[in-house]
């Protein structure tokens, strides 16, 4: 049976409704793929760019944690400057080029590995993964096959998860504590399975900032690749705050033209300067200020979507000049890549 296509997707099942405090600790999290590999600029970061990121973190007294450590820190309401560096896919360039730089600056990271490709021509082997783990790198689960699971059946995802966990346990002596969805694609059934297996959290590929009340099983990360990895862009993302959405509902007349409804507290946000984008282009929006300072926002594309994955992004400045960020990845499984 195909994964259910939900025309009404109630994300508040995970986000819930909660009381917002004046200060909530938050952590910017970044995702990298290849390091110093000019063949693939869309997923590569130049080594001088990556080292500039690390130097800035060091010079400005940031704690750099694994994802598991960061999720635990959020529970403590700590206000220590903190960042999380994650790496997807387990390419050799991480081991050869990035790991030495992390060691140089005394930082850790979380490396998400898809087990089927381990030992392939462009990928780390198990010995290199063990060596990275011994150097303090957290190893996360990125599936076995890196498949498009929204196009499969629930059993396929369950079996893939079991296969990857068995390989991790056999080769590393333990299964990972965190998971990264291939292509950032997930649904309710996948979330529920990952949570039921005892993982601490899971990450997707939409951009945003971690915070205590955020849903822990589809967490956002800022992508870092050559075009978007300039130091000023990295610093800007480090200083970004979460838009703490208390309710989110997604409806679609058809999959190609969704409508997203959000609710959040106005607090010190300059909502008249709200910006919304659909895959980088401006979107249609309507907004009203309801009782008790609740902002109700509707965003939608101005035309039918033609991509498999489309990122909706909302940013709002506050009275202190800080930007608050929320994004949502809309997936149309019927479109092949």
Regions found by a protein language model. Give the residues of each.
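Terminal accessory/targeting
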Residues: 1-81, 103-109, 115-124, 224-337
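Acidic, His- and aromatic-enriched active-site or binding-groove loops in soluble protein domains
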Residues: 199-208
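Histidine- and/or cysteine-centered catalytic micro-motif in compact active-site loops
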Residues: 114, 144, 207-208, 265
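Metal-dependent polysaccharide deacetylase catalytic core of the NodB/CE4 family, i.e.
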Residues: 25-41, 63, 72-83, 91-192, ...
């Amino acid at each position: 049976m195909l994964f259910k296509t939900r025309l009404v997707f109630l994300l508040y099942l995970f986000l819930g409704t909660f009381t917002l405090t004046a200060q909530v600790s938050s952590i910017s999290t970044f995702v990298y793929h290849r390091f110093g590999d000019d063949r693939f600029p869309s997923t590569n970061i130049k080594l001088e760019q990556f080292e500039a990121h690390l130097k800035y973190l060091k010079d400005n007294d940031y704690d750099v944690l694994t994802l598991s450590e960061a999720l635990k820190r959020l529970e403590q309401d700590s206000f220590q400057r903190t960042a999380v560096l994650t790496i997807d896919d387990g390419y050799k360039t991480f081991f050869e080029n990035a790991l030495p730089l992390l060691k140089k600056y005394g930082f850790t990271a979380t490396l998400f590995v898809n087990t089927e490709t381990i030992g392939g021509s462009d990928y780390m082997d198990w010995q290199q993964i063990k060596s990275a783990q011994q150097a303090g790198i957290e190893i996360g689960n990125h599936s076995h096959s890196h498949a498009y699971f929204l196009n499969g059946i629930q059993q396929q995802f369950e079996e893939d998860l079991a296969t990857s966990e068995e390989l991790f346990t056999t080769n590393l002596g333990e299964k990972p504590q965190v998971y990264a969805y291939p292509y950032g694609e997930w649904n309710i059934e996948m979330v529920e399975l990952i949570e039921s297996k005892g993982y601490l959290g899971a990450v997707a590929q939409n951009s945003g900032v971690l915070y205590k009340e955020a849903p822990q099983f589809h967490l956002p990360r800022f992508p870092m690749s050559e075009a978007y990895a300039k130091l000023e862009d990295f610093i800007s993302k480090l200083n970004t705050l979460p838009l703490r959405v208390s309710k989110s509902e997604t409806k679609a007349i058809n999959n190609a033209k969704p409508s997203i409804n959000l609710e959040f507290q106005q607090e010190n946000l300059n909502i008249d300067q709200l910006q919304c984008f659909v895959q980088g282009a401006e979107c249609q929006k309507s907004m009203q200020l309801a009782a008790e300072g609740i902002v109700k926002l509707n965003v939608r594309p101005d035309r039918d979507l033609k991509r498999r994955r489309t990122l909706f992004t909302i940013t709002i400045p506050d009275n202190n000049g800080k930007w608050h960020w929320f994004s949502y990845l809309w997936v149309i499984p019927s479109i092949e890549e």
